[in-house]
Amino acid sequence: MESITSIEMYVADRNAEWLGVPRLVLMENAGAAVARNVLRKFPTAKRILVVCGTGDNGGDGYVAARHLHAAGRTVRVIALGEPREELARINYQAVTRLWGVEVKAAQLPLELLALQDWFMWAEVIVDAVLGTGIRGVLREPHATAIELMNISPAPKVAVDVPSGLDPDTGEVRDKAVRAALTVTFHKAKRGLLAPGAQRYVGELVVEPIGIPPEAELVVGPGDFAYLNFTRRADSKKGDHGRVLVIGGSLEYSGAPVYVALAALRAGVDLAVIAAPEPAAYAAKAISPDIIAIPLEGPRLSTKHVDKLASLAERFNVVAMGPGLGVEEETQEAVRELFRRLAGKRAMVIDADALKALRGVRASGAVVYTPHAGEFKALTGAEPPQSLSERMAVVREQAAALGGVILLKGRYDVISDGVRVKVNMTGTPAMTVGGTGDVLTGLVAAFLTKTSDPLEAAAVAAFVNGLAGEDAAAELGFHITASDLIERLPRVIRRYAFESIR
């Protein structure tokens, strides 16, 4: 049986909406599925109690109550507080307008105990209290609600996950509803299949609710949930990411600047460029926000490796490649530095550095960001035109390299050798030079906010494309990489903080 973690389910739910399937429709389908299974398993039961929490699980319960009432059952609902989610609130209001459904609020344990006769009255109890929303030790009124449900002789039907059961591990830290039937949605939550969970789960039914398979494949707003954008009140400089950019040469000084500025706009505290002298001095002149450390000479060479390896110890992430050039001494320096840092620092490899690392296997968190030509230089493989074939090739080559590949294109394809994601944001206006450097800076920044390099790369591609779309909507096709950088904070703010739950 296919399974999914709670965060993967959250992501799929949000991304389904991004693809055009409203979450209100998903909630309606979920609640209707619960009601349908209650009627199937307990066809003679007439009196049904639905206990609803304050989140989306409670919203599913309100929908189920409405459908059970429509099927001719006598339904009572206990609301454990005002719904805190808008969709749950809509369905709460809908069920309270039904004359035939009795709804009572019970936010305190004493208020629940006063309704103990309702628990004994029921022939079936629907548990819509927590679902996948459990976090740590049970709080009130949830603990009392679970206890009263378990005391009742009526069989329990759990909505998505029995309340109190960890959806990812199947562990029960305190107490959990002992269900005769669990109706879960889209895919089985991993904890439902864990050894020892069966006595709480009972019969397990997986119901489709309209989430398309693309919701798990396509990058969307839900993927922000993998990144941590929160900040403690007592945060200090450096707590939120330090990125070292190794790039630039006599001929190319702008590329590392784009990387560093994008990383700063994506929320890192410190972005430092280590570049050959001409590029370092140019970077200092371009922006006062950037610290630039000059490396002796016109281009990177092996004589700089010791200094750079030592410098990298002060940073979370190293981004290497933009503007370095392809001279043999530079390519050799890239290979040596890559080997020195492998497994010790997260790395983003882009542009000229990609050409130096063909056949060099990665260890640790490494993200490669090639376009089609660089992909061939890195792997020896030609990326196919067909999206499905391209996905297969990127996954195969990522597995061979031991890192994450973000293959840029009309649709960006991202894989760690096992999982594959596709980013659909972007615009033809982004063919202008420098947008790939902005992407490198975003990947570097997001590697400081998650331990999952695939998701760091996926969200970076998503944000980069949205920034390009925003710039093109305002300016047409005549945009620059600087226009993207300017819009990054607004794009990130639009989606990041909805994911903090």
Swiss-Prot record:
- What would be one Pfam family of this protein? Carb_kinase
Residues noted as binding K(+) in the record, renumbered to the chain? N57, D127, S163
Sequence segments annotated as region (NADPHX 1): 56-60, 131-137
Residues bound to (6S)-NADPHX 1 are D160
Q: What is its EC number?
A: 4.2.1.136, 5.1.99.6
Annotated segments matching region NADPHX 2:
371-377
Alphabetized GO MF terms: ADP-dependent NAD(P)H-hydrate dehydratase activity; ATP binding; metal ion binding; NAD(P)HX epimerase activity
Give residue ranges for domain YjeF N-terminal: 9-217
Report the cofactor remark: Binds 1 potassium ion per subunit.
Q: Does the keyword Protein transport apply?
A: no
Entry-linked SUPFAM superfamilies: Ribokinase-like (SSF53613), YjeF N-terminal domain-like (SSF64153)
Q: Which domain of life is it from?
A: Archaea
The segment(s) forming the YjeF C-terminal domain are: 220-495
Cofactor(s) needed? K(+)
Positions of the UniProt region annotated as ADP-dependent (S)-NAD(P)H-hydrate dehydratase: 221-501
What keywords is this UniProt entry annotated with? ATP-binding, Isomerase, Lyase, Metal-binding, Multifunctional enzyme, NAD, NADP, Nucleotide-binding, Potassium
**NCBIfam families registered for this protein in UniProt:** yjeF_cterm, yjeF_nterm
User: What is this protein identified as?
Assistant: Bifunctional NAD(P)H-hydrate repair enzyme Nnr
Species in which this protein is naturally found: Pyrobaculum aerophilum (strain ATCC 51768 / DSM 7523 / JCM 9630 / CIP 104966 / NBRC 100827 / IM2)
This protein's gene is called nnr
